[in-house]
Swiss-Prot record:
Disulfides per UniProt: C112-C148, C126-C135
Family listed: Belongs to the ALKAL family.
Lineage of the organism: Eukaryota, Metazoa, Chordata, Craniata, Vertebrata
Species the sequence originates in: Rattus norvegicus
UniProt KW keywords: Cell membrane, Cytokine, Disulfide bond, Membrane, Secreted, Signal
UniProt-listed PANTHER family: ALK AND LTK LIGAND 2 (PTHR28676:SF2), ALK AND LTK LIGAND 2-RELATED (PTHR28676)
Record protein name field: ALK and LTK ligand 2
Single GO molecular function: transmembrane receptor protein tyrosine kinase activator activity
Keyword rRNA-binding: no
Length: 151
């Protein structure tokens, strides 16, 4: 649990300023002021040391949490079959609806259908939903290309 030093410092200052006999209001000499100043400086230095030590401790804990052990480091690249991420195809109707929303109705001539199918089914841009905007741009550029403009 981390406690902020400022409220504690203010509380100590208030406490030190009110300490004394409640009935007597004595004028304080320069020696009392110097000792009070020394106490405050020591208190501030202790708080700084505490916060620096606390942050170093947190950094050390953070480094050890993410470090790989000797066994983990050797096993990391061992089996490519287990580590391969399998991409699950999404609903193709949703893909089609989204691309039609971005591009509008597109027409591809029969000469261009082979290029369209290669682009639509085999590229990363048209198979991963995060890249559908790129796919829409590529499809519109293909549709307006001279090869595909012929009807």
């Amino acid at each position: 649990m981390r406690v902020s030093g400022r409220p504690m410092l203010l509380a100590l200052l208030l406490l030190l300023s009110t300490v004394g006999d409640p009935g007597h209001a004595q004028p304080r000499g320069p020696a009392d002021r110097q000792t009070l100043l020394r106490l405050l400086v020591e208190l501030v230095q202790e708080l700084k040391k505490f916060h620096i030590g606390d942050s170093k401790r947190l950094q050390l804990l953070g480094e050890s949490d993410f470090a790989l052990g000797r066994r983990e480091a050797t096993d990391y690249g061992a089996d490519q079959e287990e580590q391969r991420v399998e991409i699950v195809p999404r609903d193709l109707r949703m893909k089609d609806k989204f691309l039609k929303h971005l591009t509008g109705p597109l027409y591809f001539s029969p000469k261009c259908s082979k290029h369209f199918h290669r682009l639509y089914h085999n590229t990363r841009d048209c198979t991963i939903p995060a890249y559908y905007k790129r796919c829409a741009r590529l499809l519109t550029r293909l549709a307006v290309s001279p090869m595909c403009m012929e009807r």
